[in-house]
């Protein structure tokens, strides 16, 4: 780690259509090889599909999906006297959002629909209704933390 300066955090610019920084961060995570216009097309296309299917504000559905996927606790490896323990720790708000975004996109990419727009919209709708692979990932993470509760006194 550098002893001199802490890296400056760059401010995320809100997305042009809905004015949401969370949506902009999501778009940046969908983006591959710096192709932001492609990522925008995918995300906005998925939100349009969500709007027609859910009959609700697509940003509200998106926020609900993120909240349903965001983990409250996770396990981190801690080495104590030659043994490695999985220690449950609470997740900071920013990391909760980052993990939720990462899991949503990974789950959408793993789906079987034909286009990424269809996959992403289906995963967002599933997550908003507490279903889908991303929600399952959150449940697995919580289950791991619960199973390792005995080691919570090793927290740092």
UniProtKB/Swiss-Prot annotation:
Gene Ontology molecular function: rRNA binding; structural constituent of ribosome; tRNA binding
Subunit structure: Part of the 30S ribosomal subunit. Contacts proteins S9 and S11.
Protein family per UniProt: Belongs to the universal ribosomal protein uS7 family.
Organism whose genome encodes this protein: Xanthobacter autotrophicus (strain ATCC BAA-1158 / Py2)
SUPFAM superfamilies, A to Z: Ribosomal protein S7 (SSF47973)
GO CC terms: small ribosomal subunit
Source domain of life: Bacteria
Pfam families, per database record: Ribosomal_S7
GO biological-process terms attached to the record: translation
Keyword set, alphabetical order: Ribonucleoprotein, Ribosomal protein, RNA-binding, rRNA-binding, tRNA-binding
This protein's name: Small ribosomal subunit protein uS7
Keyword Methyltransferase listed: no
Record flagged with keyword Ligase: no
Coiled coil residues, start to end: none
Role, per record: One of the primary rRNA binding proteins, it binds directly to 16S rRNA where it nucleates assembly of the head domain of the 30S subunit. Is located at the subunit interface close to the decoding center, probably blocks exit of the E-site tRNA.
